[in-house]
Amino acid sequence: LNCVNHISMKKFLSEDSIDYQNYRFGYCVNIILEENDSIEKAFERGYLPYTGNAKNTEEIYYLARSVRINLNRYVRLSENKRVIKKIKSSLNISVDEHKKEKFNHDNKFEKFCIKYSKERFSNESLSDERLQLIIKRENYNKIYEFKSDNNPIGYVITFSNNNIIHYWFSFYDTKYLESIPIGKFMMEHIINSEKKNNKKYIYLVTSYGRDSMYK
């Protein structure tokens, strides 16, 4: 392990076996953000938040190939407009945006997220401990809540400021996959919404493997 200072961010290098599903790469470049370090700059330089070790509460990021959309160039396709309008009307979907500190991360919410992770995560599902770490991280400050007839059907945990938004973790009721692409709907809604809010970029996490191609 080699630790150095790098543009006011602590940087450390490590070697590991290659396991993309668990965010382990042959040669890992990580940083630890401190109180005055810029989260936006970390994303700009290609780093993503790391929570693989639930016992480590430092603000760790890892360097990885990820997807960034320039929202100035983003245009919603007419076919997408049609599909999205149909989904919203058929399920009577509404979307609420909450600041992290105003949202109730209660037991019902936690069970919803962990249930989704057991059904959909390709690697290890979320533990209670790791979910609590995610909630406490500084790179989470805003959550989107998707409802159908006022019943929660999905959540997206994000970091948002005046310039960017990072689409970090999404959770949804998987029964809707039988009829609609609910995950893609949630992502596209946020992309389009943040374009309207004049954000410059949206970061859509990693892009390793076939399962990430839809991004």
Region roles according to the model:
Residues 3-37, 42-71, 148, 152-174:
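Conserved donor-binding loop and adjoining core beta-sheet/short helix segment
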Residues 46, 113, 215:
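A residue-level signal for conserved active-site and pocket-lining positions in enzyme catalytic cores
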Residues 52, 56-120:
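Acyltransferase donor/substrate-recognition loop-hinge adjacent to the catalytic core
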Residues 91-179:
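A conserved beta-strand-loop-helix scaffold within acyl/acetyltransferase catalytic domains
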Residues 179-191:
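Conserved acetyl-CoA-binding loop-helix of GNAT-fold acetyltransferases
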Residues 194:
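Hydrophobic pocket-lining residues that define ligand/cofactor binding sites across diverse proteins
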Residues 197-205:
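Conserved GNAT acetyl-CoA-binding A-motif
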Residues 208-215:
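Conserved active-site alpha-helix within GNAT-family acetyltransferase domains
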